Amino acid sequence: LLPNVIHVSARCVASHALNIFGDHSDVYACRQTGYAMLAETNPQEVMDLGAVAHLSTIEGRVPFINFFDGFRTSHEIQKIEAWDYEDLREMVNMDAVNAFRARALNPEHPVLRGSAENGDIFFQHREACNRYYDALPEIVEKYMGKVNEKLGTNYDLFNYYGAPDADRVLIAMGSICDVAEEVIDYMNASGEKVGLIKVRLYRPFVAKKLVEAIPASVKKIAVLDRTKEPGALGEPLYLDVVTALASCGVSGIKVIGGRYGLGSKDTPPSSVFAAFENLAADEPKDHFTLGIVDDVTGLSLPEKDCPDTAPAGTIACKFWGLGGDGT
């Protein structure tokens, strides 16, 4: 229970080959560590929710991994509204800060840490941390509320975007959410009813809050994971969503899963269109892949040329560069 925040630009963990680029496999590998996990979509959210991570860890006494997509978000050059330290100061729980400082190692009030325990008491002590994790989501919500009040944002543990009466919904976290929003705007303007749930607080995963974010009209959900776990029944976020719905007694919603963006593979609007088109089928393909052509196991979804979903007046430029040439 040592408050700290590790800011992570999430990257690929080497498997059959080294890859230094972006996906979520390194973050998913940390699930058992007990770190809380907060996810962001773009540089502005990194600024805003990074503050939430620091404020929450001080009060909640649970360490945080605050993560965002490697390269796609971490290297994006973007204009943002930067925070001033005075903005943070007025939100900090100084009583919690002073209590944290008082727990520092000090010969005047020695404590025992890093002990070894046998089977007679280890299990009991391992469970003793439960109350801190149970209390943490409410603390995160509180500081998200403070940020919302200051900035006029609407950050929540799970944010829904799209038609209020959507019948098909994607669940994802990271930079794909901005792409999905453009596609959703286009599809809904064309008479479709689709939406997206953006996962903010990935750990602790609050099942009740996820269910509350899902419109009552939803019939099908596709969960998009940016990793691959060979041999598993599904990737981590997919399994979390399925478990959350089951634990809350939700039935009547078909849930499928898919993989995308491994090793910084691009996920353009055409991939998001393909995911929604797959959901519209009577029997959607499960455990699918996006953005590649899988001619070995046939798991990839076919992608078509898609309309331009960028806002009107957008000017697009492409720069070519390699390594350290300054591009």
What residues fall within each predicted segment?
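Short acidic, glycine/serine/threonine-rich loops at helix termini
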Residues: S15-F21, D48-A51, H75-A82, E86, ...
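Conformationally flexible catalytic loops at phosphate/diphosphate-handling active centers
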Residues: F64-N159
